Structure formats: structure tokens, C-alpha cells
Amino acid sequence: MAEAIIVKSESEPHPFTGQPVGLPVDATPARTPGPVTLEGCYGRVEKLDMRQAAADLWKVSAGHDHIWTYLSAYGPFSDAPAFSDWLASRVVFADPYSYAIVGTSGNALGIAALMAIRPAMRVIEVGHIVYSPALMRTPLGTEAQYLLARYAFETLGYRRYEWKCDPIASSTSSPSTATASLARSSREFFVWVGGDRRTPPPAT
């Protein structure tokens, strides 16, 4: 005889109407990102500091215009001063909150930001990612994304961590490598009537 499979319900009745709503969740707001240093085995992620990172990042990214293909609103840059001006504009924002990805040598090799920050819904996104060729397809490149995701979930208290990639970008496989496999629904998108709101994909 086949063993019965019990599927846990993903909804509960509304206390007044009886209609199904998402399972109850803790609605305590998450914390906003801050100036932390996240240590890994291959390097670290730290708050972007212009004084330390500008020269490092220009050295490893100058002449590699392809790294700006999907951030063409910003780069590529013609010279170091133009790049430094753009980097300085990143430092002042609380959203996106920018971090430098630093190798064991102490030199910055890339940047990433936590953005679209919605503490009340406990949803956050990683974006504005710029990896120099020295960081692409390296253990540190993967580890940096893991460190940011762990920080968002375990320290800040977010429930949903988004990473949006252009489907034709060569780095599209990176999110699943670094964190988790992708699902075909918007899970834990926001808290609604005290429960978890999910948006399923259109029927095919």
C-alpha cells in the first residue's frame, strides 16, 4: 500500500470571514542594513568606503567596459575621476546601501548593494552588483552573495531576499549557486492581514 502523503496547508481561515488567508507570520519589522564587516573564508564584505575602495576598484575595472552592460545608466567611465564621482554618490545612500567585496589581499574587487528595502514587509533585494574580472567566477564572488543573504536573513530578520537578473546575462546561474533554487511564485512577498501573501505564476 502506498504511504499517505500529508500536505500541510499554506492557508488558514480569516477570523471574521472564514475565507482563506496566508499562514500567520511574525509582523515585527526587519532592521535596515548598516556598516558591518562580514568575514568569509575567501575575503570579506564591508561598508563601501571611498577612501579605501576607489583606487582599488578603478584598477581592476578600468578598460573592462563589459561589466557595465547591465548597469549602463552608470558606466562605463572614461577616467578615474568620473568613476570616483559615481562611487561617491553611492556612499551617501541608505537605499541602496552599498558594500565593497574585498579579497584576502585587502583590495576591493567589486561592489554590491542591499536595496528596495521594505522592513515592514521584511523584503529586501541585492542589486547594483559590479564584479571586476578579478572577482568573476571566483569562490569569493559566490561567497560574497552568501554572506549578504545570511546577513539579511539571520541578522536583519528579512523573510524574502530578491536577486533580479537579466535572463540573457551570463551570470544568471549565480543566484542559484550562491543561495537557493528559484521558484515559480513570488513567495513571502508581503504580509497581508497578518499572514503570508504569495503571488502564483499565470496558468500555462
Which stretches of residues belong to each language-model region?
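Flexible ATP-lid and adjacent glycine-rich G1/G2 motifs of the Bergerat
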Residues: L148
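Hydrophobic residues within well-ordered alpha-helices
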Residues: S174-S176
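Conserved catalytic-core motifs of GNAT/GCN5-like acyltransferases
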Residues: A180-D196
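Conserved beta-strand-loop-alpha-helix junction that forms the acyl-donor binding cleft
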Residues: W163-T172
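Glycine-rich acyl-CoA binding loop
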Residues: G141
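Conserved GNAT acetyl-CoA-binding A-motif
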Residues: E154-K164
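GNAT-family acyltransferases
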Residues: A2-T138, Y151, T155, R197-T204
